[in-house]
Amino acid sequence: MNEFEIDNEIEITDETELTYDLIAQLKKKYKKIWKTTLVDGTEIVWRRLNRKEYKQIMKDYEDIENRGERLMEREDAVCRAAVLFPRGEALEEIIEYMAGASSVISDDIYEKSGFRVAAPEEL
């Protein structure tokens, strides 16, 4: 059984179900969390990336020469860093078997992490 401790009080395993109690615990820890529902109904709960995490992800994959491959690896890494539920093998299966899932989820994560803050306003 893969276990990923988000903190000492919140433990997510492959058997963990998304409940109101779990959502409340995650909100208490991260303040703001979001949910993306994939086309098959799978619910993905995630948080924002912070600047340090973003910079590390960019650095970790900068040596991949192929731009498309580099982008896909970064999208997967963003999901692994920010997705709170599901975790472990369940998340890896989503990334592996739903080709566009990490792209969709990472786009949502980027948006709420400040990469599309607001539309410019003419003065």
Each predicted region: which residue ranges?
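Short, basic/low-complexity N-terminal boundary segments at the transition from targeting/disordered tails
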Residues: 1-27
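Short, surface-exposed, charged amphipathic helix/loop patches that serve as local interaction elements
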Residues: 2-4, 30, 39-123
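A short, compositionally biased
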Residues: 26-34
